[in-house]
Amino acid sequence: MIELGLRNDVYRRPLMTALDRLGLREGWRFADVGAGGGDVSGALAEIVGRDGRVYAIDSDPAARDQVAELAAASAQVVAITQAGEDLLLPEPVDLAFCRFLLLHVHDPLVVLTRMGGAVRPRGWVVVQEPITTAGRVGGVAMSMPEARHPDVGALLPSLARHAGLAVVAAWAEAPAGAGPGPVAEYLAHLTGVDPGDDPVVLPPLVTVVARRPD
């Protein structure tokens, strides 16, 4: 299995499973759409190496530059300031990836369609999005009022198909725990609230692995 340098990422396992499925390797070109803090870009850059290329894409120039600096230690990096709905790359890539992006955009279908158009024929699109209200803290449903589409993960396989992609695999995974540990730490970082000893089931993360048709 591909080993990613994401030791503190409680959602790393479904990403590793997805990358194993598509065979990410040295020399690939990939786009991290909505790259955020850059942990995933940096980890994947280590795999594609100096012969590969990373497109670090974010609507926030500061976040984009942070990602580019992190990934540049391992691969060629092109930093682009773009919203997902406006995604346009200078060349086709082997993989377009996003995680925790579609819940915030205006139109998830437009972003997925753009991602599909950004990859080469038979290229890969990997998307990971939550079903926020399926998460629980002490048995109480979680919410994310600031998100436009907090449960977009539940629609993800259908959205991928409507974007013209061929869905190869789709599944959901939810980290869970009680008391001190990575799950509680992740929730505290996300919300600013320590759950203490309450049982926590984080929002299931739906992963879709899809391909652009020939």
Place the predicted regions along the sequence by residue:
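Conserved catalytic/acceptor-binding region of the Class I
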Residues: N8, V126-P180
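Conserved alpha-helix/loop element of class I SAM-dependent methyltransferases that forms part
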Residues: D9-W28, A43
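Class I SAM-dependent methyltransferase SAM/SAH-binding core
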Residues: A31, G37-L87
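Conserved Class I S-adenosyl-L-methionine
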Residues: A154, A166-D214
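A short acidic, Gly/Pro-enriched loop at the edge of an enzyme's catalytic core
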Residues: L87-A96
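A short glycine-rich, Lys/Arg-flanked "PGG" loop and its adjoining helix->strand segment in the class I
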Residues: L109-W124
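Residues lining the SAM
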Residues: C98-L103, Q128
